[in-house]
C-alpha cells in the first residue's frame, strides 16, 4: 500500500502522450528559426545558462514552446507576477493542448504574516484568504511533475518558498490496482492519513464517502473528476472516474494513484518524532531566555509552544505548523527547505521570463522574511527553528536550478554574466513590425501636446498609454483628461491582480481610450491596439526612467503598425540616450531584414480573451480571512452572450445555476442574486 519514493515507479496516464506536441497554425519566422536552433544546440551540449534577448512582439513564448518540443524535457517557467504567469499559462496551454500544462502561484488572495512591533508592543496574528481553485492547481502541478515527462509548469517566485518534502508526499500516496486485495478499514485509514475528510452528505474536493463496499474519493488536485472504488470481498473489483456533480461515468481504469490532500501531509510517526525534537529545542531555548532574565518572553514561548505540541500530538496539526517545518522534514538547522525545485527531475529545463525583474525578486525574498521572523524569535513568539521556514536564499536557488534560459528584452548584468556571452537575439518580428519611432519633446508643453496626440489616436481608433513619475501626477492628469472629454482610466498599485487584468482588457475592447499609470505598464502585457506611449518627465534619471525601464515602456507600442513613443524631456540623460540607441539599432536591423525579404509590416491581431481564465475563481468561492467579506467581487465580467452557440449557452446556464444554488446554500444571497440576474440575461440573449 505505501509506495516507494522512486518517482520512476509512478503510474502514467496511458491515455495521454508522454511527449510534447506543439500545436500552432504558424511556423517559425524572422529570427525565430535561428534562435530555436541555437538554444536547443546549447541545451543539448550541456550549457548551464543562456539568454534569449527578445524584443516586444518577437514571439518569445512561441520560440520557447518550440525549444520545449525539441528538447522534450519537463519544464518550469518562472514569471515575475501572477498576471504574467496567467498570460503565459494560457499561451502554453494553447500551444500544448495534449500535454500537462500547470499553474503554480501563491494560493493566498490576502496574506497578513505573523509579526511583532516592539516599539508599540503590538503582536499581529497571521490572517489569510486562500483561493481553493489555485490550491487545487498547485497540487495538480506537483503531481504532474512527479508522474509525467510532458509537464510544463508556469510559476511565480512562490516556487522558492517551502513545500512539504517530496519524499513524504511520495511515500504517503495510495496506489490502487484492480484485483488488489485491500481491507476497507485500512483503505479508509490511509485516506485519513492523506488528510482526506469523510463526508457522507456532499462529495467535495479532498473528501470521500463510503456506501457499502463502494468508496467515492474526490482527489484534492482535481476539479472535474472523482474516483469510485468498488470492492468485492476485500478485492478491488472496479476503478472508475466519474463526474462528481452529475455522477456520469467518464472512464474505467486499471490503476490509479491518490496523492495527499496537502503538500504538508506527513506520517504519524514523523509527527510524533517532530514533537520530541520540538520539546528538546523548547527546553534549550527556555534556558537561554531565563539566563538572559527574559521571563516574559520565556513564559510566552512556553505557553504558545506547549499548546501547539498538544494539538500536534492529538490531531496531527496546529495553526502555524509551517513554523515547525524543519522538525517535520528532519532537516538540520540552516538547511534549505524543500521547494517546488525539489519536485523537478534533474534533467529539467528552467525558463526565467522577464528575467531582469524575476532574478532580483528571487534575491530579495529571503532578507525580508528573515527580518520579520528574527523579531518573533527574539521576543518569545517563536522557536529559533521558525527561521528555517523560509524561501530559498539566492545561492541555494542557484544550486538547485537546472539548465536555464533567461528571457528578456532588457537582460540584466547577472543574466549576461552567467550566460558568458551566449546571448541569442530575437530582434526581427515575424509580422515585419519595426520598433516604434521615438520622439523627444519639451516638458513645458507636455500635457497640451499629449492631449492633441491623444485626439489624433482616438480618431484612428487606437489606444494610448501614459506613464508618469508620481501617483499625484497620475491622478491629476487622469482628472484633467477626463474633464476634457477623453475616456481615461488610472491604473494604480491599490488595484489587485484580477481587476488590473479586467482594466487592460477593457482598454483593448475600447471601453476607454487612455490608460495612465506609473510603473505598471512595462513588462509583458500584450496590447496590440496601443499605438502611442507617452513618457512624461523622461529626463528624471532614476529607477522608473532607467535604460531598461524606458526600453520596456517604449516596447508597449511595438505591436502596432503606427507605433510611436514620445519622451517628454528638456535634457538628454544617459539612460535616454542608451534606450534610443538600442531602439535605433533594432529598427535598422528590422528594416534591413524586411527589405531583403520583401516583407510588408502588419499590425498584430490578437484575440481579446480573459487571460486569467482557468487561473481564477469567483471571489465568493474563496475561503475568507478574518473580517473579510466572502462575497466581495473584484471585477464584474461582461461576456458577449450573443456570440455564443446554443450548446455553449446550455453549458453556461448549467454552470451558473450550480453556482447560484451553492451561494444560496452558503447563505450568500447577494452573490446568488447577481448570478440569477446573469442567468436571466443569458436566457434573454438566447431567445433574441
Curated annotation (Swiss-Prot):
Limits of the UVR domain: 650-685
Chief localization: cytoplasm
Motif (Beta-hairpin): 107-130
Protein name: UvrABC system protein B
Localization terms from the record: Cytoplasm
Subunit structure: Forms a heterotetramer with UvrA during the search for lesions. Interacts with UvrC in an incision complex.
GO cellular component, one term: excinuclease repair complex
Region (Disordered): 616-646
BP term (GO), one: SOS response
Alphabetized PANTHER family for the sequence: UVRABC SYSTEM PROTEIN B
Compositional bias ranges of the Basic and acidic residues kind: 633-645
CDD domains according to UniProt: DEXHc_UvrB, SF2_C_UvrB
Superkingdom to which the source organism belongs: Bacteria
Organism: Xanthomonas oryzae pv. oryzae (strain KACC10331 / KXO85)
InterPro entries: Helicase/UvrB_N (IPR006935), Helicase_ATP-bd (IPR014001), Helicase_C-like (IPR001650), P-loop_NTPase (IPR027417), UVR_dom (IPR001943), UVR_dom_sf (IPR036876), UvrB (IPR004807), UvrB_inter (IPR041471)
